[in-house]
Structures are given as C-alpha cells and as structure tokens.
Curated annotation (Swiss-Prot):
Keywords: Cytoplasm, Ribosome biogenesis. GO terms for biological process: ribosomal small subunit assembly; translation. HAMAP family: RimP. Its main location: cytoplasm. It is found in: Cytoplasm. One of its GO terms (cellular component) is cytosol. This is Ribosome maturation factor RimP. CDD domains: YlxS_C. It comes from the Bacteria. It comes from Maridesulfovibrio salexigens (strain ATCC 14822 / DSM 2638 / NCIMB 8403 / VKM B-1763) (Desulfovibrio salexigens). Belongs to the RimP family.
Amino acid sequence: MEQGSLAKKVSQFVEPTIESMGLTLWGVEVTSANRPAVIIYIDSENGVSIDQCAEVSRDVGLMLEVEEVIDSAYVLEVSSPGLERKFFKPEQMSAYVGKKIDIALVFSLEGRKKFKGLLQETDEEGLLLKLEDQEDPIKIEWDRIKKAKLIHEFK
C-alpha cells in the first residue's frame, strides 16, 4: 500500500480513539527508511504529556495489531507535533497566521521549490506568504504544497 494512503487509513482508524481520550489527531506519517515506522502526532489545547503519548501508543498499537490495519512489520511512534510542527491539512495553518513557515512545493513557482516566510493569510484556495527577500507576498495554492512546517523563533 502506498505510504500516503496507508497514513490516511491509519488516521481514519485511530482518530475516534484519540478523540475519546480528549486529544486531537494532528497527523500520521509513514516512513519506509531502514525500519518502517508509523508516526502518530497528537495534540491538545494544553499540549500533551509523555504519559498521554504512552497511553495512545498502547491503545492504538493494540488496535492496529488486532485489526491488522498494517500488513507488515513496523515501529509505532506517538509524539506531540513539537515546536516546529509539520502541517498535515490546510486548516491547521490558519492558527499560525503571523508566524514563520517553511514550505516545499511539488513543482517550481517563480523558479523555486522552497520558500520561507511569514504566513499572512489562508483561505480555501491557498495561502499568502511574505518572503524576506521580496516586497510583495506570494500566493501559493494548496495543491502545490508538498510539505509545510512551522519555524519556531526563540526570543
């Protein structure tokens, strides 16, 4: 199964359980490096504790095994999204307007595939990004974005 569709399948399967624990499923990532891994990111308004990550790992891990959602050996990781969180859905970004983000595109825009800048706004079509090296912000459509993450600025 393709990694993107496996991540979606796992997301749909585990989200009700995670929500029943008072948490939010931030996203699911599937990697196939040296050892295949399923990484589940959870969040809440007050952040998440190590104990909450462990509880989700136990409960969700057991469910994934019993229901045989994944048909090969894998490592399960449960984590908070962290300070430099990846964005999995466009609607996650609206809470970070005014913050710096890092974006990688599927294909080039203005001769580049990577952008860093200040997120100025989001809407149903895409986002507006103010780059440090340009006066005018650029509009990037959601379907052009391959990866996006928050850049945490220490003060």
